[in-house]
């Protein structure tokens, strides 16, 4: 039998640290959560509001589309508005096709952005490709900005792909078309990074990404990239989809890669429901990193799934209420109660696992199941502290949780 430690996450891959507007990506820094707006960037009010919402939800970096003159002209105004709101969030400019022109024509935009994202597959075509790529890299050097070279399988460099397909055919097709495509994605990123360095962009100013839409392709491509370079890597499954499908696909793909020690920043690309909440993707990214033990963002509320013993919905309603209140209060609690993100709360529904799970939590309650004595023992720091009874068990436990937070983490804040 293999030792238990063999199943622990592999050590983080050594990568070059990149400073993105004060947020360190790579170099052993905690994996950074980022997101992207879906507003028209020229809509300054709408974009500022969404960036603020994403940042408040926990996005440490936010990417915005810069696709035309009006968008580029809006960027410094957006940056200024955010600063006046007291929001110091790095803005990433997402450029396709005409990024070289927009950066040259709008120097205030070039200065206001914390990083440029460029796609080697559409930065330019044929004889214009290298020149337009170089123009963007030179702008990054001039303004001392990092660059993410973001390859996407949907806009892959067709010249490179054709070349590799022809070479594979000449060798008698030893690789499948899918394997050749993976190799083309990897080579596109690495060759572009090499060219950027030749132009003069420092290695600590380059982040790579290789976006695909299938789980197995993401695992393969990032494993290849990680073995061939020490560049900081941005993980993300593009076009993951809506709802549970998108969450499951992103978690399956990035969870495996992160377990291998690969990845320095992540974005969960969920398609929101019509008029849905864009911050959902930030929440999922945080939860992925937290459940895997890589970072702590918010107190954990453990709750049993329910069974025939738990015909009452009290434990479900209480768990939901506590989780909702925690998420709502976290922006204030982070400042007021340092370390509160490490809190573990248990809300269990019957006697089978309730007491044991509650003992493992910092504070937990075991609510009575069907036919059980209508009493709810509360455990604090592993010890039974008291038993709640009566119609206000839920409200009483909520008050105990708040009291526990104030006593444990409020004292820490005062000491600091």
UniProtKB/Swiss-Prot annotation:
Pathway, per record: Isoprenoid biosynthesis; isopentenyl diphosphate biosynthesis via DXP pathway; isopentenyl diphosphate from 1-deoxy-D-xylulose 5-phosphate: step 5/6
Superkingdom, taxonomy of origin: Bacteria
Family annotation (InterPro entries): Dihydropteroate_synth-like_sf, IspG_bac, IspG_bac-typ, NO2/SO3_Rdtase_4Fe4S_sf
Catalysed reaction equations from the record: (2E)-4-hydroxy-3-methylbut-2-enyl diphosphate + oxidized [flavodoxin] + H2O + 2 H(+) = 2-C-methyl-D-erythritol 2,4-cyclic diphosphate + reduced [flavodoxin]
The EC number(s) this enzyme carries: 1.17.7.3
EC category: oxidoreductase
GO biological process: one example: terpenoid biosynthetic process
SUPFAM superfamilies listed in its UniProt record: Nitrite and sulphite reductase 4Fe-4S domain-like (SSF56014)
Pfam families given in the database record: GcpE
GO molecular function: 4 iron, 4 sulfur cluster binding; 4-hydroxy-3-methylbut-2-en-1-yl diphosphate synthase activity (ferredoxin); 4-hydroxy-3-methylbut-2-enyl-diphosphate synthase activity (flavodoxin); iron ion binding
Residues where [4Fe-4S] cluster binds: 304, 307, 350, 357
Cofactor binding note: Binds 1 [4Fe-4S] cluster.
Alphabetical UniProt keywords: 4Fe-4S, Iron, Iron-sulfur, Isoprene biosynthesis, Metal-binding, Oxidoreductase
Cofactor(s) recorded in Swiss-Prot or TrEMBL: [4Fe-4S] cluster
Function: Converts 2C-methyl-D-erythritol 2,4-cyclodiphosphate (ME-2,4cPP) into 1-hydroxy-2-methyl-2-(E)-butenyl 4-diphosphate.
Entry's family note: Belongs to the IspG family.
HAMAP family assigned to the protein according to its UniProt record, in alphabetical order: IspG
Record protein name field: 4-hydroxy-3-methylbut-2-en-1-yl diphosphate synthase (flavodoxin)
Gene: ispG
């Amino acid at each position: 039998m293999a030792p238990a430690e063999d199943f622990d996450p592999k050590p983080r891959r050594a990568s070059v640290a990149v400073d993105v507007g004060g947020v360190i990506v790579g170099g052993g820094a905690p994996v950074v959560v980022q997101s992207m707006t879906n507003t028209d960037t020229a809509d300054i009010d709408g974009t500022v509001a969404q960036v603020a919402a994403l940042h408040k939800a926990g996005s440490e970096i936010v990417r915005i589309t810069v696709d035309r003159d009006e968008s580029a002209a809006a960027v410094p105004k957006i940056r200024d508005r955010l600063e006046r709101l007291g929001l110091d969030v790095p803005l990433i400019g997402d450029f396709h096709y005409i990024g070289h022109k927009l950066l040259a024509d709008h120097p205030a935009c070039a200065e206001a952005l914390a990083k440029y994202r460029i796609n080697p597959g559409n930065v330019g075509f044929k004889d214009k490709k290298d020149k337009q790529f170089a123009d963007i890299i030179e702008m990054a050097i001039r303004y001392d900005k990092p660059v993410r070279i973001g390859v996407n399988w949907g806009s892959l460099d067709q010249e490179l792909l054709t070349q590799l397909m022809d070479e594979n055919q000449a060798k008698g097709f030893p690789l499948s078309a899918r394997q050749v495509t993976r190799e083309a994605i990897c080579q596109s990123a690495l060759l572009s990074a090499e060219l950027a360095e030749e132009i003069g962009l420092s290695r600590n100013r380059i982040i790579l990404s290789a976006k695909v839409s299938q789980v197995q392709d993401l695992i393969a491509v990032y494993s290849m990239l990680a073995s061939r370079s020490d560049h900081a890597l941005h993980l993300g499954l593009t076009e993951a989809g809506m709802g549970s499908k998108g969450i499951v696909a992103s978690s399956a793909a990035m969870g495996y890669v992160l377990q291998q020690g690969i990845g320095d920043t992540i974005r969960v690309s969920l398609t929101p429901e019509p008029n849905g909440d864009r911050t959902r993707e930030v929440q999922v990214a945080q939860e992925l990193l937290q459940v895997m033990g890589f970072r702590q963002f918010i107190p954990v509320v453990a709750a049993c799934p329910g069974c025939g013993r738990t015909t009452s919905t009290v434990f479900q309603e209480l768990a939901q209420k506590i989780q909702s209140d925690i998420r709502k209060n976290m922006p204030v609690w982070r400042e007021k109660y340092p370390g509160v993100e490490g809190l573990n709360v248990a809300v269990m529904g019957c006697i089978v696992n309730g007491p044991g799970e509650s003992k493992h939590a910092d504070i937990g309650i075991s609510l009575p199941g069907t036919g059980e004595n209508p009493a709810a023992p509360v455990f604090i720091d592993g010890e039974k502290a008291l038993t709640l009874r009566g119609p206000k068990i839920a409200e009483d436990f909520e008050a105990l949780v708040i009291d526990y937070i104030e006593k444990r983490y409020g004292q820490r804040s005062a000491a600091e």
